[in-house]
Design a protein with these regions (language model features):
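Metal-dependent polysaccharide deacetylase catalytic core of the NodB/CE4 family, i.e.
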Residues: 44, 98, 119-240, 273
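Active-site beta->alpha N-cap acidic-glycine motif
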Residues: 52-65, 70-77, 81-166, 174-176, ...
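Aromatic-lined carbohydrate-binding/catalytic grooves of carbohydrate-active enzymes
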Residues: 76-86, 94, 135, 339-372
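Aromatic-lined carbohydrate-recognition surfaces of secreted/lumenal glycan-active proteins
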Residues: 230, 237, 387-403, 450-489, ...
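Substrate-binding cleft of secreted/luminal carbohydrate-active enzymes
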Residues: 37, 260, 264, 342-343, ...
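His/Asp/Glu-enriched short active-site or ligand-binding loop at hydrolase and phosphoryl-transfer sites
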Residues: 130, 134, 192-205, 226-230, ...
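Active-site groove signature of glycoside hydrolases
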Residues: 100-105, 345-352, 408-445, 504, ...
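Catalytic domains of carbohydrate-active enzymes, especially glycoside hydrolases
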Residues: 60-79, 125, 327-353, 412-423, ...
């Protein structure tokens, strides 16, 4: 772009700007020094539709220009990566209200539209480049942005000379999916262990780590060669990053990692920085509101989100072939899509011989025989087809003679399912002694609580290195209280929530309505901050008796009335799915419009099979 055109574009954009008015969100409380928020953009075009554009990540040139105009007059202070590095190493403080702007993928608009705006407003930004896209591996880039619509190294160097543009790696060639299960799903290349179809196996840890390290080193070396400076950051494609990847990135020479789609405030010593993903062609006013929301909510809003869930055994989707299993999965997802809940809890182990101990798994593991490898496929399809957050439930003691087995199983689950939404440990009645007035301080009970707490922490430690940080996976503990003896339940919950994101209480309340309501009255004494982190599960009736189903329905409504918004049912199956839809749709569904009601998506007479 020549200077004359740059000036003309700047003048044209300036004429479209809106005056700074009261509609823009104003900071009421400053972001502290040495803290930073980050917004992420992608392509910038003149013709982005106000709604329903072909690219949900694109923003209209006018909207970005108006945002820059507002930003330059606001209390926000745009900073560089260099500023964060100096704050880390030299103790040079970041200003109040620091903001880091990032643009991913290296679309041509980085040079033709964003760069002129940076110069006009003297605002710095970071651009994340998939280096192989600039070196001829253009297929994925052209599919995303169109033929020839990527920046080249000459343009990148011109931007760098201005001092307003810094460049980070977006990997060399990890901006795509890789085969992640035998059924054929492709998932983010960085966090997924590849399924090697010709060998009918997954990558080993060593193979996976070497593949990622080789890619990052190559991208690092390309950026250093082309730009003459040591690159500082890796911006992970799709925001897919975990603790294992953080360490590999540091080996490759990257001191900063960036995730995606996760709102929050960053501190200068964070290893991975959260970035808020801008979508749907946000206006300047909406972008200013986004910044204010980040300041006001931060991480604590994570617990305010409702969870309406069904819990089921994964073995119900098993079959003699993957094709037959897929048919079962497809029908399940159709039913959940009709129900309009938002969370699915799967139990991926099974007790085949009925001895009370789990002896087979439905995911790749060396800890016990694998009956069928269907967990990853089920999880991915539930997320992408039915909009379900998927939580995996493991018994605290799958096998009594192996006290630490659950931690090893959780590790394998997380390795091959980095995008899961949570892991729930089922402690059953193990802590019921701590809910009773008379036994709270007895030595046996205290020891039992201590052992379970240690095992819980060990399990979290085993799984966390593999979980995608952008997904904000949560750890929960499932308890089955005795409704007759729960005097100390509130005190126990407060204690457990110091080690768990959530605590789930399961009740079989059919025929015990009085005791159940008393339990709810006890839970209602808790402050809202605790209620936000409590899940309640009701066991489904084993028969079709209308009265029993009506009791469960009323129980779910009663849960809502005391301000608990995370609730669901256990024992979901093809046989009772129609009854769930018939009796429990109103409390379970998150559908707020009768116009959007979906009828039951089951096959005729399926429940009679």
């Amino acid at each position: 772009m020549n200077n004359l055109f740059s000036k003309m574009l700047g003048c044209a954009l300036a004429s479209t700007l809106l005056p700074l008015q009261f509609a823009y969100a104003q900071i009421e409380k400053d972001l502290p020094k040495n803290h930073v928020v980050s917004l992420t953009f992608h392509d910038v075009r003149d013709d982005v539709l106000k709604e329903g554009d072909r690219d949900i990540y694109a923003i209209q040139t006018k909207n970005l220009a108006q945002f820059f105009d507002w930003l330059s007059q606001s209390e926000w202070k745009p900073i560089r990566l260099k500023d964060i590095e100096e704050a880390r190493k030299q103790g040079k403080e970041l200003p109040h209200n620091a903001i880091l702007l990032t643009f991913d993928d290296g679309a041509l608009s980085s040079y033709s539209r964003i760069f002129p705006l940076l110069k006009q407003y003297q605002i710095p930004a970071v651009f994340a480049l998939p280096t192989s896209w600039l070196n001829g591996n253009t297929k994925a880039g052209y599919e995303a942005y169109g033929q020839g619509n990527l920046v080249n190294w000459k343009q990148v160097r011109e931007m760098q000379v201005s001092g307003l543009a810094e460049f980070a790696s977006h990997s060399d060639d990890l901006h795509h999916g890789v085969l992640a299960n035998p059924q054929g799903n492709e998932q983010p290349a960085a966090t997924s262990y590849m399924y090697l179809k010709s060998q009918a196996r997954y990558e080993t840890d060593a193979e996976y780590q070497q593949r990622i390290l080789n890619d990052l080193k190559k991208s690092h070396d390309v950026l250093k060669k082309e730009l003459g400076v040591e690159p500082k950051a890796i911006v992970w494609p799709y925001g897919a990053v975990n603790q294992q990847l953080e360490k590999i990135a540091q080996q490759a020479g990257f001191n900063f990692s960036f995730s995606l789609g996760r709102d929050g405030v960053n501190q200068i010593n964070d290893v991975t920085f959260k970035r808020s993903l801008m979508v749907d062609n946000s206006t300047a006013e909406q972008l200013s509101e986004t910044l204010l929301n980040i300041l006001n909510s931060a991480e604590k809003d994570l617990y305010k989100q409702p969870k309406h869930f069904v819990s089921m055994d994964l073995k119900q989707l098993a079959a003699l072939s993957n094709t037959q299993s897929d048919e079962k999965l497809g029908l399940l997802l159709s039913k959940l899509y009709s129900l309009k809940n938002n969370t699915l809890i799967l139990k991926p182990l099974d007790d085949q011989d009925g001895d009370g101990q789990d002896d087979v798994a439905y995911f790749p593991t060396t800890q016990m025989p694998v009956k069928q490898d269907i967990l990853n496929r089920s999880l991915w399809q539930a997320q992408t087809r039915a909009g379900q957050a998927v939580i995996l439930e493991l018994p605290i003691y799958p096998q009594k003679n192996k006290p630490f087995l659950v931690a090893d199983l959780a590790k394998d689950i997380a390795r091959f399912n980095s995008n899961l939404s949570g892991i729930q440990l089922n402690a059953g009645t193990a802590l019921n002694c701590a809910m009773q007035n008379t036994t709270l301080n007895e030595s046996n009970c205290v020891q039992q609580v201590k052992q379970l707490s240690q095992l819980n922490q060990l399990t979290q430690k085993a799984a966390k290195p593999y979980l995608n940080m952008s997904n904000q996976a949560q750890f929960s503990l499932l308890l089955t209280p005795d409704l007759e003896h729960i005097e100390q339940l509130p005190a126990l919950l407060k204690s457990l929530l110091t080690q768990n994101d959530l605590v789930n209480l399961k009740f079989n309340m059919v025929g015990k309505q009085k005791q159940f309501k008393q339990a709810l009255e006890l839970l209602n004494t808790l402050d809202a901050k605790y209620k936000q982190r409590i899940m309640l599960t009701l066991t489904l009736p084993e028969n079709d008796q209308k009265n029993a189903w009506q009791e469960v329905k009323q129980g779910l409504f009663d849960i809502q009335r005391i301000g608990i918004q995370k609730f669901g049912v256990d024992g979901y199956s093809p046989k009772n799915s129609k009854s769930v839809h018939q009796y429990l749709y109103n409390p379970m569904s998150l559908n707020s419009s009768s116009v959007m009601y979906q009828p039951f998506a089951g096959l005729a007479n399926e429940g009679k099979k």
